[in-house]
Design a protein with these regions (language model features):
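Bacterial N-terminal signal peptides that target proteins for export
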Residues: 1-12
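Surface-exposed short loop/turn segments
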Residues: 27, 100-160, 171-178
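A structural "domain/chain start" motif
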Residues: 22-88, 198-206
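Compositionally biased, intrinsically disordered linkers/stalks adjacent to structured regions
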Residues: 169, 177-206
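C-terminal motif of bacterial Sec signal peptides marking the signal peptidase cleavage site
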Residues: 17-20
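Sec-exported extracytoplasmic/periplasmic mature domains
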Residues: 67, 91, 95-103, 126, ...
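Second-shell loop/turn segments in exported
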Residues: 74-85, 104-106, 175-183
Length: 206
């Protein structure tokens, strides 16, 4: 029985390896941002625009994260609940990053000095749990999931775009994503939330 299980396990690994390591690519413009014309390449998986005015804002309205990713009906990988959980996780990660150590206020109402944060998930690539537990596959990246997103900060009163980003990538080869389909996507979102906090801190001279 053990031999059968072992054969099945390694068979699944080799089959997935033979299929190659899927990585999230730039999904292109999703039509979510209010303006794409000022985006500039920061690195191979990151486009960004910064007006230089973010330091004037210390309060933030976080809109519900939009799910712009659409699965092919003939090949549904994620349940609706998994995608809804991903949206909630991203918003929570951003809220925690902004307010950590008494950083910034998350509010509900528009006002002077308040920016509105809009985030849309544009792609999700599933984590293959069976390929995420060995040293070899972690090094090669086999089984890594990922995600892509678009986001912007706009003045809550005027709608002026303050910052805009388009990001995509795969999960961590070090951190364990577990056996959930969205484990690596969540790791990425946690990282992106921390990057946002760092950008705001930098704008405030912290």
């Amino acid at each position: 029985m053990i031999r059968v299980i072992r054969a099945f396990f390694f068979g699944a690994i080799f089959s997935a390896l033979a299929a190659g390591c899927a990585t999230v690519q730039n999904p292109g413009q999703a039509g979510f941002l209010s303006d794409y014309s000022k985006l500039m390449e920061k690195d191979e998986n990151h486009l960004v625009y910064d007006s230089g005015n973010l330091g004037n804002y210390s309060k933030f309205i976080i809109e519900p994260v939009a799910m712009l990713y659409r699965q092919p009906e003939e090949k549904r990988i994620f349940t609706d609940k998994e995608l809804e959980d991903l949206q909630a996780h991203f918003k929570s990660a951003v809220s925690e990053a902004l307010t950590e150590d008494g950083g910034y206020q998350v509010v509900e109402a528009s006002a002077s000095g308040t920016a509105r944060l809009r985030i849309g998930i544009t792609d999700v690539d599933d984590t293959i749990g069976a390929l995420n537990i060995t040293i070899y596959t972690k090094i090669t990246g086999a089984g890594l999931g990922g995600a892509a997103m678009e986001g912007e900060l706009v003045d809550s009163m005027t709608g002026e775009q303050l910052v805009a980003v388009s990001r995509w990538g795969s999960g961590s080869r070090i951190l364990r994503a577990g056996f959930t389909h969205t484990g690596d996507a969540k790791i990425l979102m946690n990282r992106w939330a921390k990057d946002l906090r760092e950008r705001i801190d930098e704008a405030h001279g912290r």
